[in-house]
Amino acid sequence: LNLPPELDKAQADIDAVVLQKEDASRHQKFEEAANLRDQEKKLRAKREKMLEEWRKKRDEKRIVVDEDEMLHIVADWTGVPLNRMEKKETQKLLDLETDLQGSVIGQERACEVIARALRRSRADLKDPRRPIGSFLFLGPTGVGKTLLARTLAERMFGEKEAIIQIDMSEYMEKFTVSRMIGSPPGYVGHDEGGQLTEQVRRKPYSVVLFDEIEKAHPDVIQLLLQALEDGRLTDSLGRVVDFRNTIIIMTSNVGADVLQRNNSVGFDVGVDSTRDYEKLKERIMDETKRAFKPEFLNRLTDIIIFQQLAKTHMTKIVDIEVDKVAKRLLDLGVKLVVNEAARGYLVDNGWDEKYGARPLRRAVERLLEDPLAEAILRDDYN
C-alpha cells in the first residue's frame, strides 16, 4: 500500500517519540516519559485522522473495473463478442428481421429467410460441426447484398468490423488459390499464413463475405467445401482454423438477367406472391446450377434471391442517406433540414432501375454533400 508522504512523516514522528519515551523510562525520568506518552497519543490520533481522510479521498477517486469492462477487454483480446450480451440472445434472434429490414430496404423476403436460418442454427438444430450459416446471395448490382452482410455482422456479433470481406476477382487464376490458406513451404509469404485462414483465426466470430464468387477459380470452390462441410480449414503452417462460429456469405450476379427480364412477370416489386417468387427462383436456380457444381450448392444453408429495387424503395433509402449526412453535420454543430421536395429531387436524379441504389448514393454526394462542403468551408450557413 503506497501511502502519501504526509502519513509517512507522521509515522516517523511517532517512532521518534516512542524511542525518546523508552529512553526516558530506562533512565527513570518518569515525568518526561509521561509527557512523551501523552505526545505519542496526540500524534497517533492526528495520524489516524489523516489516514481516514486519505482513504475517503482515495475511495472517491477509485476506478472500479466492473463486469462489462472485463467483457470488453476479453472481447478485444480474443475477438469473441462478449461485450454485447446485455440483450438476450434469444430476443436478438427473434427481432433479427426487424433489425435487418430497418437498414436493408426492399429486401424483406431475403431478411426473413436469413433470420429463419440463423434461428434454426442457434436453436441447436444444425450440425454442430458446420458454420452458423452459409448463404449464396443472388441478385443484380446495387440491391443490398453486401449491405445485408455488413448489417448482419453488426447485429449478430456486435460491431461493424466483425466482417471479413474477400473480393474473389483477386482469385481468378490458379496460382492465386494458395493465398487463401498460405503459400507452401519454400515460397514467398509462407510464414504469413493465408489471407482467409489468418483473418478467421484472429476473428473467429465474424461474417466471412466472398464477393462475386462466380469469378473465383474452380479450385477456390473446392477449397471452401471443407469449410462449409466440416467447419474448418488447415493453413500452410499446419494450424486448424475453426469456421464453426462464422457466417459464410457468397454474393453473385448469376441470374441477374433473369430478374431484369422478369420484372413484370411475378417478380415486380408490387407482386409479393410466394407462388410467383418460387417460379422465378426455379428459373434462377437453373442458371445457378449451370454456374456452380452440385456438391457446392448442396452444402449451403440457403440460396437467397434479392429483388430489384423500385422507386418507392428509393424514397426510404434517401431518408437513410440524408439522416447519415445530418448526423455527421450535427457533430460539427450544424443542423440540416431537407424537405420532401428536395428528397424527391434526389430520388428523381438518383433513380436507375438497372443499377440499383448506387446511383442514388452518388446523387446524394453530388447534390447534397458537395454544396454543403462548400458552404461549410466558406462559413456560409446559418
Where does each model-flagged region fall?
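AAA+ P-loop NTPase nucleotide-binding core of proteostasis motors
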Residues: L1-N382
